[in-house]
């Protein structure tokens, strides 16, 4: 197949990020300069974001059988790039106090972003697997980047071993699907899986093993055991990337697979997914109740958020509203998580020991950093799904989709899970306004709001509030991504 100029325009974000990887590599080889390499990375990611406008002008098209570039791909590429940009921004002040090599951090984030973009455009099980590996392998290094701290190294080893096991399940599942269907393209799978073929034992086993592999990457129950330990052990900026870009890219490609190949038409697969969604919502929220570590708490809460999203995925066959619900929910989850992890990143630095992730570190934050405490409060309220925040809009969409698809027991789980979540999110918010301890442990820099990371946190808070009151611009963008499927 010949690559045309139009194809190259469609692949601009992928090409720009790939070129940035090469430039940063050469820059590191030439001269180690933290500021220079951080700047090059941020310029590359911003250029990739801007290039999405040109991709939109080119229109939807298939670029080789492995990738399809359309509105859906553009939406998820944009979300991945925003998350990667925020990660680099939060990492800069964190790395300033890091005594070992700093520059490779940006290289690993860029390679992981490349994997996320590939997943957003994936239209084939081969590109799905390649994208997942491209996003996972750099994360092994990123999670253990603060390797002189025992927790970080332990988290990296745990994530590496379990991720390798999950990848083998995913690959074996794909092999079984190929053995039965004779094709790996999403569109071809949709054509080949008609007439009750989905009930074939080999196909059910294949998709079952793929659910195990993807369930691990999305940290769904019962494949979630790595999540709290890795979130706690990883540096705060890396936890940001794990919670946002990684989850968004993988969930986006799963959505496309379910849309083209009627996987959800199988009653057995629907039941399994419904049980996983129910368990993720209830278990994730219950386990978060007892946490005194903010990163562990956010890790468990991310399990429940992916459970809410699964409700919309199960209802995908009932109408386009499910796609809209997932797009809006993921945007809300992205900005809320960026704000929450951004505050943790601003409060942390490697030369002061482990991250400021204990709930006690945030007690009375309002009395000496009022704006930072207000931002953290907004993020907690949004993650809890309180009205007037973007998190509420996303949760309302998920409930509406569940009701439309008559998934009553899952709707009940969402309501109960949200009620439980309200308790532990408010516990974090309330602790910010208690009397500060006589000897406060950690603190953000006095000029935090003028740093790039501080600006990202403030913009995230502003978007969560503005789009929570007036969500129409976001809904319009998400709807633009749908007709091009």
UniProtKB/Swiss-Prot annotation:
Its EC number is 7.1.1.-. It catalyses: a quinone + NADH + 5 H(+)(in) = a quinol + NAD(+) + 4 H(+)(out). GO terms for biological process: ATP synthesis coupled electron transport. The chain crosses the membrane at residues 8-28, 35-55, 71-91, 105-125, 127-147, 159-179, 203-223, 235-255, 271-291, 297-317, 326-346, 373-393, 408-430, 455-475. It holds the Pfam family Proton_antipo_M. It comes from the Bacteria. InterPro entries: NADH-Q_OxRdtase_suN/2 (IPR010096), ND/Mrp_TM (IPR001750). GO terms for cellular component: plasma membrane. It is found in: Cell inner membrane. It is a multi-pass membrane protein. Keywords: Cell inner membrane, Cell membrane, Membrane, NAD, Quinone, Translocase, Transmembrane, Transmembrane helix, Transport, Ubiquinone. NDH-1 shuttles electrons from NADH, via FMN and iron-sulfur (Fe-S) centers, to quinones in the respiratory chain. The immediate electron acceptor for the enzyme in this species is believed to be ubiquinone. Couples the redox reaction to proton translocation (for every two electrons transferred, four hydrogen ions are translocated across the cytoplasmic membrane), and thus conserves the redox energy in a proton gradient. HAMAP family: NDH1_NuoN_1 (MF_00445). Belongs to the complex I subunit 2 family. NDH-1 is composed of 13 different subunits. Subunits NuoA, H, J, K, L, M, N constitute the membrane sector of the complex. This is NADH-quinone oxidoreductase subunit N.
């Amino acid at each position: 197949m010949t690559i045309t100029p139009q194809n190259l325009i469609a692949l601009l974000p992928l090409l720009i990020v790939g070129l940035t990887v090469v430039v940063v590599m050469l820059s590191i080889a030439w001269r180690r300069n933290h500021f220079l390499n951080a700047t090059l990375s941020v310029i590359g990611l911003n250029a990739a974001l801007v290039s999405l406008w040109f991709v939109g002008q080119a229109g939807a098209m298939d670029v080789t059988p492995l990738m399809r570039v359309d509105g859906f791909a553009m939406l998820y590429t944009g979300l991945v790039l925003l998350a990667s940009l925020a990660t680099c921004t939060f990492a800069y002040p964190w790395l300033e106090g890091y005594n070992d090599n700093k520059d490779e951090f940006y290289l690993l984030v860029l390679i992981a972003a490349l994997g996320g973009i590939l997943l957003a455009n994936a239209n084939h099980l081969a590109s799905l697997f390649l994208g997942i590996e491209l996003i996972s392998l750099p994360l092994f290094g990123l999670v253990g980047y603060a390797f002189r701290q025992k927790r970080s190294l332990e988290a990296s080893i745990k994530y590496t071993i379990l991720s390798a096991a999950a990848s083998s399940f995913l690959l074996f599942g794909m092999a079984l699907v190929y053995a039965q269907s004779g094709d790996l393209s999403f569109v071809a799978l949709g054509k080949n899986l008609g007439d009750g073929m989905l009930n074939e034992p080999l196909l059910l086993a294949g998709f079952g093993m793929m659910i195990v592999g993807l369930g691990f990457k999305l940290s769904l129950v019962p494949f979630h055991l790595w999540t709290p330990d890795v979130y706690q052990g990883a540096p705060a900026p890396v936890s940001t990337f794990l919670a946002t870009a990684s989850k968004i890219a993988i969930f986006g490609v799963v959505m496309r697979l379910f849309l083209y190949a009627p996987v959800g038409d199988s009653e057995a697969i629907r039941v399994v997914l419904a049980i996983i969604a129910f368990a993720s919502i209830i278990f994730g929220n219950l386990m978060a109740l007892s946490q005194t570590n903010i990163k562990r708490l956010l890790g468990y809460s991310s399990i429940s958020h992916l459970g809410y999203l699964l409700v919309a995925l199960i209802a995908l066959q009932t109408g386009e509203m499910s796609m809209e619900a997932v797009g809006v929910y993921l945007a809300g989850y992205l900005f809320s998580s960026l704000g929450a992890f951004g505050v943790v990143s601003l409060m942390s630095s490697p030369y002061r020991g482990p991250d400021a992730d204990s709930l006690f570190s945030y007690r009375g934050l309002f009395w000496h950093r009022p704006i930072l405490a207000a931002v953290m409060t907004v993020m907690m309220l949004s993650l809890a799904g309180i009205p007037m925040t973007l998190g509420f809009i996303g949760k309302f969409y998920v409930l509406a989709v569940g009701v439309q698809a008559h998934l009553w027991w899952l709707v009940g789980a969402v309501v109960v899970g949200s009620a439980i979540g309200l308790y532990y999110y408010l516990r974090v918010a309330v602790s910010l306004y208690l009397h500060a301890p006589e000897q406060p442990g950690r603190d953000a820099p006095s000029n935090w709001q003028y740093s790039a990371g501080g600006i990202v946190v403030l913009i995230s808070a502003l978007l969560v509030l503005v789009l929570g009151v007036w969500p129409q611009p976001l809904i319009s963008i998400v709807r633009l991504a749908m007709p091009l499927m």
